[in-house]
Curated annotation (Swiss-Prot):
This is Schlafen family member 13. GO terms for cellular component: cytoplasm. Can also use Mn(2+). Zn(2+) binds at H284, C286, C321. Its cofactor is Mg(2+). The keyword Nucleotide-binding applies.
Amino acid sequence: MEANHCSLGVYPSYPDLVIDVGEVTLGEENRKKLQKTQRDQERARVIRAACALLNSGGGVIQMEMANRDERPTEMGLDLEESLRKLIQYPYLQAFFETKQHGRCFYIFVKSWSGDPFLKDGSFNSRICSLSSSLYCRSGTSVLHMNSRQAFDFLKTKERQSKYNLINEGSPPSKIMKAVYQNISESNPAYEVFQTDTIEYGEILSFPESPSIEFKQFSTKHIQQYVENIIPEYISAFANTEGGYLFIGVDDKSRKVLGCAKEQVDPDSLKNVIARAISKLPIVHFCSSKPRVEYSTKIVEVFCGKELYGYLCVIKVKAFCCVVFSEAPKSWMVREKYIRPLTTEEWVEKMMDADPEFPPDFAEAFESQLSLSDSPSLCRPVYSKKGLEHKADLQQHLFPVPPGHLECTPESLWKELSLQHEGLKELIHKQMRPFSQGIVILSRSWAVDLNLQEKPGVICDALLIAQNSTPILYTILREQDAEGQDYCTRTAFTLKQKLVNMGGYTGKVCVRAKVLCLSPESSAEALEAAVSPMDYPASYSLAGTQHMEALLQSLVIVLLGFRSLLSDQLGCEVLNLLTAQQYEIFSRSLRKNRELFVHGLPGSGKTIMAMKIMEKIRNVFHCEAHRILYVCENQPLRNFISDRNICRAETRETFLREKFEHIQHIVIDEAQNFRTEDGDWYRKAKTITQREKDCPGVLWIFLDYFQTSHLGHSGLPPLSAQYPREELTRVVRNADEIAEYIQQEMQLIIENPPINIPHGYLAILSEAKWVPGVPGNTKIIKNFTLEQIVTYVADTCRCFFERGYSPKDVAVLVSTVTEVEQYQSKLLKAMRKKMVVQLSDACDMLGVHIVLDSVRRFSGLERSIVFGIHPRTADPAILPNILICLASRAKQHLYIFL
């Protein structure tokens, strides 16, 4: 138990990760008096805790001084040196600070990160490790790799594996194998390895070298000795160019001494060697995944004509990938315990890097948070080029006023002040000690952080002020025994997310304080401040620059969401909501149980729908199966269903079944709904209003410009669609595609179909198109079917050569019947150029090109879209269909007319 984890307490009074390592002897003189075993055990507990906190967002190590003296004392040189070795950095205070309160001693640990302030050439890997457990040969020595060397080594091995994969089966690789064989056989040690006998005292004709190591047998515990040296030496040879480990040769004189036959059994020794090598952890970047290749030779050592003993020679081949001596020594906090990282986890985190975008992607997105200078658990954050940077969003949403303190958002501040007498005075009283900063109000900071709302909370207020740590205030209607737990848990989550999601690299804690607005008097404060721990002064925000840096991390926490790019890139990437999207998202669900959201093509309606369902779950404490998402087509239904945030159904299924357990409904792409199967809007209203005392949420997202039929949609008249919000910031499409969409929208305005309300068309005048995103639109006319499929295949091949994959491409036709007509011809043309699969849009996560109809692809997107002969039964809605088609393409659009 001790070797794997220490107890971790997140106590009700601690809104931080606090690891209690028990009793530790402190002070240099006191530690010198300890037995070595006890000193090592205490040091190991502290170092494991420090490493785990560094890799988990920072926190506090708490210990009780084993020496009964309460006078101030230092840690001890061995502890300090071990902490310096852990961070591989000379200045302990960059990551650690200490405080003592009586017999309680605290080490405050800042999160690990590739901090930009390391200007002296120091290197911070993605995670902190006590040991990489990686070795290589360096001259005649075995070199233990530090973090920088381990990172470079892993990257080199990864590149070699990729190169070998690309050139697999080609003659050059066979030549390289032959070259290795010749080098191996030309090694002078090879002759000894081939012999069966050797004379005691013979001096070998070759010295130690990068490929040769001499070791003597120890006189006692021979098998244990061999088992102990194998991990370092065998892994070092395997990680370099291979080599020979001689056991039984004096390394100075090169004399063969062997081991007396009475002290060793050859077969047992071979078994020990095999067992030790089989335990070596290996990590592969290649597809073949072989084990470590080695051979063991036991050579008989004769003294004259008498058998004296044995010489052991282990021949190791260079390994294709990476061999460790043991699992790397690195820890993280998981499920309230310190857990060691597995070898595979360690390699994955060490090599964690910003994703490699295809060239066009890189031009279309701007980095908001890079892994190169962020804490270990962060994911990269990108925004579409032309959208607000996190600094702009911070200035818009949470500006730091010069020289005074402000409450924001102002509308919520006024509303709460009018609703709750004495609230303004209570908050003002708490703010008096602070001269500059911002108080960010929320009806529930817990909900904002994806936690459940607590009944009885009037509001939460986050104070970000100069010369203070951040403080989270929870204001209760009346005293509540669970109020402090709620506030502490919320503050804890906020601190963790500021670091591990928002990428804040400074020293930070969030104190928690509960206030009670009692009915008898104007205000009554519960003075139980968060933590008896007094954080060091460096945890306070020194000025405007520090406050703004923290608030920019807060922007990522509040506006960040899992990007749809994650599925395409194969790693988790975050995007940011626009300010307009966030303002709608932050509306009170209790006051906006029904809302119509009108959004232009590419304005993020489906993303908003997903975010709102997550918020519903936390505000109303409901399970995912009580939230229903309804759309028109099966592919979008499947896409949402795979997110596991709700129950998702099509309109037809919604009208056919009863849904007795559903409480909240979110409807997407409502402009394409129909009424031939029944009145879906009336049914949705009936379901969400079943509970008169607590009606459910009904939010409806739509865009009349993307209406794909001339029938009645079942939506209420435009004049009855209130309350209503609009999404007018178009964020999806490249410039040329956006221009094409605008042209088609203008045609609709000039001659609108009969089922599009004229009042809706004015939304176009409010549109804001994000400029500067590269891409192209190409309209191709009068191609034959053969020419079309050949053009698509050739163009796809060019895109794949540039780094795109089949999952970036969609080919859209007018009807499902046409899908069948095009499939065989398109597949035949594709397979002349490359091996590729086609599938419909119901499986959006597979590695294939999507071939489906424009209507069924509604609500989905791809970087590259080919539209083949888009047409409709009624020409009046052709511009709508073309908008539906074009708006699915993020960067490259090809339309065959």
